[in-house]
Amino acid sequence: MKFSSLYCFLLLLIFQTDFGQNEETSRRQRRKMYHRRLRKSSLSTHRSVRQPGIQQMKTVTPAAKLPIINLDYSIEENFESFLSVPGVESSYNVLPGKKGHCLANGMIMYNKAVWSPEPCTTCLCLNGKVLCDETKCHPQMCPQTIIPEGECCPVCSNTEQREPTNLPHKQQSPPWEEMNRALRKEELQLEEDEEEVKQDENREQKKKTFRPGDWGRPINEGQSREGKAQRPEEEGRQAHQHRNPARENEEDDDEEEEDDDDEEEDDDDEDETIRGDTFRMPPRLPIPATPRGIPSLPSMCSLSYKTISCISADLTQIPPLTAPEITSLELIDNSITSIPDEAFNGLPNLERLDLSKNNITSSGIGPKAFKFLKNLMRLNMDGNNLVTIPSELPSTLEELKINENKLQVIDEESLSDLNQLVTLELEGNNLSETNVNSLAFKPLKSLSYLRLGRNKFRIIPQGLPASIEELYLENNQIEEITEISFNHTRKINVIGLRYNKIEENRIAPLAWINQENLESIDLSYNKLYHVPSYLPKSLVHLVLIGNQIERIPGYVFGHMEPGLEYLYLSFNKLVDDGIDRVSFYGAYHSLRELFLDHNELKSIPPGVQEMKALHFLRLNNNKIRNILPEQICNAEEDDDSNLQHLHLENNYIKTREIPSYAFSCIRSYSSIVLKPQNIK
């Protein structure tokens, strides 16, 4: 009895399993046949409309180089300073800026300035340190991602965004469960479509049935109406076939190929029936193909985070682009010669435009080429052939660069309406006091950074705006500084006058002594024979490298408050008689760096041991032969010196004859450089 019951139960189980598989197979076949009918009907009645546009490349989020951002979002700074990192020394080619400024990409950033060197990266200048932060993006588990406008991180392009796998509170479902959910959703959609088709068929049948009021109408009346409605469609179809017979043949071939593919898929499905004792991984979800008919960017161009870059792309004209979402356009190092009025009509929201290293001429720029760029803030036209500043520049400009051109004149109207301009760079042109109008800079109410280096000025340009804070006039022919040179520039903080022809007796006593904000002056490579007198009392940095200076007059720094901190006198002709104990009077308490290398000193200058704040001392490449006791360390004092770097190499010192306590106040002997020495 038990055996017969068990046998019947097994037969019933086998029958149920076979019936379930057959039911599933028939359901899948019906679904595919239905989708095939829908696809054929859509191919026969609808044709895709191609729309022009721009094919975007996949956005690549650049990784910030500095600083290092840990997993807990803490920041590790890489702050290069010889005052805090052993072995790093000052550079002669760096002009110290205002205390708290930062140097980034060749530009001096103000304290608390914020900028974005790369997409998704934000940097902050804080008390001389550059702090950068990068937006971290979680990976998306979807076939295609997009970056929404104004965002850094990609999101899924479909409506259902999958959860990231790295979230701890949610566990990713197995792939077969995802496939089952997709199949269930597809079945529900299929049932809804079938219901709609049935409803449409019922409506058509109701229309064809005669109502009681229709018996008196002729039957051919409805036929004639249908014929009239179908006649234009038939005529249009015949005309289309007559014009494009080849295209019709291609479409028929495509439909036949699709039918063959569907049949092959049906055969494969029949062979790959899922059995109860086997497991088969579900196929990959289809990835949508790129729409056909969308034109791509010009060759050698790229699109990344609202920026179009065409660097060294062999362009001879500005490409016609229509993309209102683009905010930055780079056309660097091409062969563009002209800018027509309508060049940027398709880019109305441009904020940054870089046209450097081209062959653009002033005559090739339309009078309204830039007028309608209402959001433009940064314009770079370095390395072109401009002889005048372009007209009708937008009033929103904050930065204008026209370096390395052929500018020959700046009149009163050249910079009109640029009242928001902060940075102006006009280096490497043919400008002088004869072709620059004294009222040219008057409209620039917000200008704080002005570069006029590598021109032909013989005096300081007149009419500088009162808002100016940094002025650079390197590589000109300036010979004197008069009392009225900086009369109206009370906010000026940095003056760079390297490589000119200035002599100390051509600097007027009242030229800058009353400036209250002037902290940095660079007079390197001029014709100075001693340290200039009447320096600003607010001075902090003084750079006098590469002159003919033979002495430092006494009390020359005595009037300064709070006091000089950085003094660079390298590559001069200083001798022992040119420095005495009162030469550094007024700077003993404040001097942090003193560079006296590459001179003709035979001994360590007096007063070094009294410089309590000194961190960096260079005396290398002189003619020093011995180090006397108490020239660097005072034996009567027990406190350690703040000196962290002492350079005495390339002199004539006999290291074995140095007194044992000569460097006793220095905390680490590794900070003293004594070798190599000259032998003579």
From Swiss-Prot:
Top-level taxon of the source organism: Eukaryota
Job of this protein: Promotes matrix assembly and cell adhesiveness.
Phylogenetic placement of the source organism: Eukaryota, Metazoa, Chordata, Craniata, Vertebrata
Protein name, per record: Extracellular matrix protein 2
Gene of this entry: ECM2
GO CC, any one term: extracellular region
Glycosylation sites: 359, 430, 487
Keywords, in A-Z order: Extracellular matrix, Glycoprotein, Leucine-rich repeat, Repeat, Secreted, Signal
Ranges in a coiled coil: none
Residue positions of motif Cell attachment site: 275-277
